[in-house]
Regions:
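Active-site-adjacent segment of SDR/Rossmann-fold oxidoreductases
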Residues: 37, 58-68
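Active-site loop immediately N-terminal to the catalytic Tyr-X3-Lys motif
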Residues: 37-43
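Active-site helix of classical SDR
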Residues: 12, 48
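SDR active-site lid
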Residues: 65-134, 141
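Catalytic tyrosine of NAD(P)H-dependent dehydrogenase/reductases that use a Tyr as the general acid/base
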Residues: 9, 45, 128
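Residue(s) in the substrate-gating loop at a strand-loop-helix junction
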Residues: 32
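A short helix-coil junction within the Rossmann-fold of NAD(P)-dependent oxidoreductases
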Residues: 14-23
Length: 160
């Protein structure tokens, strides 16, 4: 758990002072679709990715006055060696079924979509329709720069 979180915290702490001095910058965090909603069998992983999202949400607000932008990538199951090994050996059966429905994306698809979103000023990058719905459903207090996304979030929000 600590590995996923602190390997993002320490480099961020190192680069932020220099970015502030420079007057601009961008920090990108790699979370996961599993960091948007809790998944059975993924407790430590999901918790660490939720923590990254919380860190990104907070520092995005703190760094805005310094012209430093922040983005979060929440990729779905991605076709990598680690994923293939995990899928073949230890992935819970419920996740295998979800993967069959949601599909698997290539690392190239994930990278291209994130770079495009950064260039267009988006805070959150997701992949596919299921990822988009997750982004809308788990927006919370995260910044939103897309009018369409903001409308979808407002339309699906429950009143309390």
């Amino acid at each position: 758990m600590a590995l996923n979180f602190y390997t993002a915290v320490y480099p961020t702490r190192c680069v932020v002072p220099r970015m502030k001095d420079r007057g601009f910058g961008h920090i990108s965090f790699v979370s996961s679709a599993a960091g948007q909603f809790a998944i059975w069998g993924y407790s430590p992983y999901s918790a660490s990715k939720f923590a990254l999202r919380g860190l990104a949400d907070a520092i995005q607000m703190e760094l805005l006055p310094y012209n430093i932008s922040v983005s979060v990538l929440c990729p779905p199951n991605t076709e990598t060696g680690v994923f293939k090994s995990f899928h073949a050996t230890t992935m819970p059966i419920i996740m295998r079924k979800m993967t069959a429905v949601a599909g698997i994306v290539s690392p190239e698809q994930v990278a291209v979509s994130h770079v495009n979103d950064i260039e267009n000023g988006h805070y959150l990058t997701t992949n596919g329709l299921m990822g988009w719905f997750l982004g809308v459903g788990t927006a919370g207090a995260s910044p939103e720069r897309s009018l369409i996304q903001a409308f979808a979030q407002a339309r699906t929000m429950k009143t309390f």
